[in-house]
Amino acid sequence: MTGPTILPEAIYDELRARIIDQSYAPGESITESAVAERFDVARPTAKMAIERLVAEGILRREAHRAARVPQLDAADVVDLFDNRAIVESAAVAKLATEGILPAAAIAANRAIAASKNFASHDIAFHRALVAGQPSPRLAKLHDALMGEIELCIGQVQAAHLLTAAEVSEQHQGILDAILAGDAARASQLSNEHIAGSRDRLATSINKDIAESI
């Protein structure tokens, strides 16, 4: 008697969560055969989940090589977060101007305050802000960045660079500025929040490199 069928979506979800929470370390390979064995599925099913993660930037695959969790250096982090800041500051300014306060962002921030493992809720908060503003093109730009950004958010949590309380408090400031209709303040707080995470993570990565030499 065989067990229940596991759909590619479920495999994708679990792999994604385990990569974000650093259960799979940066640089670690994730092969189709290992995934197929772990989930007791055919290799084509495992491949579907892996290829989806590659398309999102959560995994990288070179030609004829196994997929690997990206190893981002400090320059990668700075580049990603600086571009993210451009998109997210524009998004929160639009929300404030339009008088839109996404309920999903409020719910995600409440979940952060109630959780030690807050990376998934942190990700949900930022995705909800950008998804809630009226420009679909801005949302597409954000989505293109978020795969690698989510890896970074997972690293921030794993290295204890920010506490859930600190993240939630900074998010609440952004929400309050949006609610007040203060586009400039919302944009400023968004930039400060992203820059703080960027600087802590880049410093942590450089420290790890220096200690390994």
Can you name each region flagged by the protein language model?
Residues 6-9, 81-85, 140-143, 161, ...:
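Alpha-helix N-cap/helix-start motif at coil-to-helix transitions, marked by capping-box chemistry
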Residues 100-159, 167-177, 185-196:
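Conserved amphipathic alpha-helical segments that form helical-bundle/coiled-coil interaction surfaces
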Residues 195-205:
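Short arginine-rich
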Residues 94, 128, 200:
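Short alpha-helical functional segments enriched in proximate histidine and acidic residues
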